[in-house]
């Protein structure tokens, strides 16, 4: 039995249990001749237990026979940081000019534990520094030890 060859990858951020044929999902899948309804059903079933509307980075692998598989990653660090800081959006200014909120180092460590599978490190301290850097870029002050 021969192995399927990969035709391409599609990277999308899709809300949990919220895949619909509307843009951006429909056009992205339609260009690669993927069954849009089947993907939406499979994705919504796979993410049904999660909180609705959570943004989920998803990598869809399209094969030469127009079949597909997908991998759902953890939500972006910015989603968790905004949730911990109780803000709706980050700062539009540069790092030190306009801080819009605070987040603790312990919160950054908790986020790092959740995100470590998607980060380019397996060291929890390095992952925490990555999350702290994301917080600073969003205009969040990291407080704590």
From Swiss-Prot:
Assembly notes: Part of the ribosomal stalk of the 50S ribosomal subunit. Interacts with L10 and the large rRNA to form the base of the stalk. L10 forms an elongated spine to which L12 dimers bind in a sequential fashion forming a multimeric L10(L12)X complex.
Protein name in the entry: Large ribosomal subunit protein uL11
Post-translational modification: One or more lysine residues are methylated.
Coiled coil: none
Family: Belongs to the universal ribosomal protein uL11 family.
GO annotation, biological process: translation
PANTHER family associated with the record: 60S RIBOSOMAL PROTEIN L12 (PTHR11661), LARGE RIBOSOMAL SUBUNIT PROTEIN UL11M (PTHR11661:SF1)
SMART domains listed in its UniProt record: RL11
GO CC annotation: cytosolic large ribosomal subunit
InterPro entries recorded: Ribosomal_uL11, Ribosomal_uL11_bac-typ, Ribosomal_uL11_C, Ribosomal_uL11_C_sf, Ribosomal_uL11_CS, Ribosomal_uL11_N, Ribosomal_uL11_N_sf
Gene3D superfamilies from the UniProt entry: Ribosomal protein L11, C-terminal domain, Ribosomal protein L11/L12, N-terminal domain
Recorded superkingdom: Bacteria
